Each structure stands twice: as structure tokens, then as C-alpha cells.
Amino acid sequence: MNRLLRWILLVALPFALLMGGVAWVDPFNYFDGPSPVPLETRRANLRHSGATMPHYTLTWKLIEFRRAPVADIIIGDSRLTRFDAALVSSITGRALYNFGVPGGNTPSMLRTFWYADSLARLETVYLQTGFRNWSAAQDYDIWEGPAWAAASAVHYLTDRDVLGKAWLDARAHWGSVQAEGIADDQWATVIGNERAVLEQYAPAPHFAAELRRVAARCRERGIRLVIIDLPVHDEVHRMEEELGLGAGIAAYKELMRSTAAYCDFSGPSAITADRAQYIDALHTSKALLEGVIREIWQGP
């Protein structure tokens, strides 16, 4: 019996140490307590690489929002990375939570709505999206892993990706790990990726049905639903035209207009022509984004 107990303890010890290490570092601030790694470092490492950004960012935000839910949220993709929620709050006098996730797609955005709706008495929901997000080719999963890890302390402490993030945070704090920067060929890379996305475009009626279900819930609960289409550079619009996507874009915009209040800044327009106002063809400069924010929340 004693030998069996010792064997069990020896087998369990490495797992206990791993779980203890994860709890100590607390890579996604689940326990919201002291950690040897500063909060700023753990938050910065959400953007460590393009491969991990979707999972890491969504995990962090699911945990953070559950701890302190608010009534107004904006849900979207990487184009909300530089979105200044504090600027919106300074205009409206209301807290706004930014649920923007790099790599976010329509399924994850709509599931985020239901998650937030389960935790808060929502009053205003802004959905930042774009034509590219409404293709059936964009129906991939980034939700399940983060949602599982955020669901309980046991899940959190035993999740492989949480362990990986804890190791990353430790190396960033005590070592010399550096986050990926913006590559010199960022523009060309984004354009190439966007062409591949647009070439695979196919209507996604199940996305439309789920959006209508969200809109129905908003009407039922008295939630104001606003859809925001941020600017993209005209090089994207030229590709859309070249690929014959005009009818698909028109149908997409009609769906948005018929479902909720629709703020369409996507272009083509004067603000989508100036390359200097863009980090790459899909992502605006902070200055241009702040101008759009002021137009939406303050009016012309």
C-alpha cells in the first residue's frame, strides 16, 4: 500500500508542479492576483505571433469580460487592434468593451455575442465586420479552445495552450523572447492572403441565419445592434472588381442594412485611396480609425 501511494505521488508530482507553475504565472490573468510576470508582459505576449494571436487574445478577453462585464461591447477582428474604446467612452460617457480578436471570423464573433449576452444585460452591441468575413470559406473554428480554457480553473490549469503561454511569459520576463514585428513585406503578404480569401468566396446562408437570430435576440432584449464596416484600401476593391464579386458584395451590404443600423465606411471613397493612411490594405492607421470613431459616435 505504501509503495502504491509513493508511486501515485511520484506520478502526480510533475503534473502538480506544472499546474502550480501555470497558476503562479497566470498567463491569462484568470486568478487576477500577484504574478512574477507583470501584467503588461502577459498582455503584450497575446500578440507574440500571428499563429497564436487568435487563441491567446480570445482566451484573455473571455476571462476578462466575465470578471467585469459591461453593457456596451464591440465585437470584431484584427481591425479593432488599434480601436480606442477609451475615446468612445470619452464621447458617450459609457464603458465599452473591445472584443476584437485577430483572426476573428463570423462564427466566433456571433458566438461572442451569445457569451456576452449570458453574462451581462447588454444595451448596445457593435459588430465590426466586412465582406470577406461572410464567405463560407471563413467557416473555421477559433472558439472552442479558448472557451474551454476559460470555462473553469481546472480547464485553465490543465490546458496545453495555457501552459504554452505560461512558458512564453516566463521566457519573455526572464529571458530575451521578442514578439514578431510588422514585416517589411506586410502589404504584399496581406494582399496575397486577401486575394486567396476572395478567390474562395462563396455565399454563407448559415451565417446570415445566425446573424438574424442575433438580431432577433437584440430586439427581444431591447439591445441596440450596430454593424460597422471599416475602411479597406482601394487595392482590395480593385481585386474584388477583378474577381467579379460585385453581386456578392451588394447582397452582403443589403443583408447588413436589412438587419441592423449599418455604418459603411468600407469604400471605395476618399478615405480608402490614400495608402499612407493604412498599415496594410486591411488595417487603417490609428489616426484614420480615430476619425471614423468620431464620425460614428459624434456624427458629422
Question: Could you tell me what each predicted segment is?
Answer:
Residues 124-221:
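Secreted/periplasmic serine-hydrolase-like ester/acetyl group-modifying domain
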Residues 243, 247-300:
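C-terminal regions of proteins
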Residues 98-103, 197-204, 239-242, 278-279:
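Second-shell loop/turn segments in exported
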Residues 70-71, 94, 121-124, 219-226, ...:
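Loop/turn elements at helix/coil->beta-strand transitions in domains of secreted/extracellular proteins
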Residues 68-152:
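Membrane-embedded segments
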Residues 110, 204-212, 243-253:
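Well-ordered, non-membrane alpha-helical segments in soluble/globular domains
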Residues 215-242:
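Active-site segments of SGNH/GDSL-like serine hydrolases
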Residues 1-69:
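N-terminal secretory targeting modules
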